[in-house]
Amino acid sequence: MPSNPKDVLTQGAVKPWHVIFIVLVAYVVGGVAADKLLRAFDSGLRPYVRDGLSVSIAAVIMIAYTLVVPEFRRVLPILFRRARVPVTRTDAGWAFAVALCWGYGLYRAGFCLPALQLKPEWFSVVGLNEAMPDFQFRYLLLLAGPVLLAPLAEELVFRGFLLNLWIARWGVWPAIIASSLFFGAMHWERTLFAGVMGVGFALVYLKYDSLWPGIALHAAYNLLTFYWLLGGLFSIKDRATVQDPSNWIPEIALAILFFPFAWLFWRRFRPGRPAG
């Protein structure tokens, strides 16, 4: 059996557009199903529940397709093998740090703040809230989708299948860019945020030649951004003063840190860097 996932994927009839179709179906069905299931749900809680439920449904659909298609099943042992090189604490730390500095720093200070200064009505669109409900233990169920199912399904489909199929066709960098753009597009209003994250996840996968490190990074980021953890600290803003940069000091500080952190991340994860 070939040891390279792209060789296994290209031996059969599966094409990139097949994967794209599966992803589109999964996300559309997930979104529609979540909206219908939450119609009678408390409107104040609905925004906190909807994304988690939608991504859970989409992830289940993508995983189900994977188990049905023979080419996908055959490549699973290769995609989920042990990392080619050990995952060091330093590498993991820089990867996580640059993800946080992008998601809660440069993306918010460089995109969300200017967008709100132009269009204050986008307050909810960029993921902000004026308050959140008190925490209840049942909300821990909301973590199942973003922390368990989504990292597994999305890394499998976007990095495991699409990235490898496009590497076989176009080469490494066109494949990284194309798979990341599609990953971003499937996150709708957070396209820019997710697209850049997709590049990072792709570099992590290529360094280790295994999906496990990327799944762990993806899951850790999603866990920390839970509304009642770090997410709430950055997502709660006063609508009346949200356009004032003085209310975005933490985001601006993280945005500044993003650049040296991204350089250090690149030094360790750039494609073609010697292993180790």
Please provide the spans of the model-predicted regions.
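Short, Lys/Arg-rich, polar N-terminal cytosolic tail immediately upstream
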Residues: M1-G12
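Membrane-helix interface segments
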Residues: P16, R89-G93, Y139, R169-P174, ...
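Alpha-helical transmembrane segments in multi-pass membrane proteins
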Residues: V19-V75, W94
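Hydrophobic core of alpha-helical transmembrane segments in multi-pass integral membrane proteins
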Residues: V23-V32, S56-L67, V98-A109, W248-R270
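Juxtamembrane helix-loop-helix connectors linking adjacent transmembrane helices
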Residues: R39-V49, P77-A153, N164, A168, ...
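Membrane-interface helix/loop boundary segments of multi-pass membrane proteins
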Residues: A153-A178, L203-S210
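Hydrophobic residues within alpha-helical transmembrane segments
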Residues: A178-A185, A216, A220
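C-terminal membrane module of polytopic membrane proteins
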Residues: A219-G276
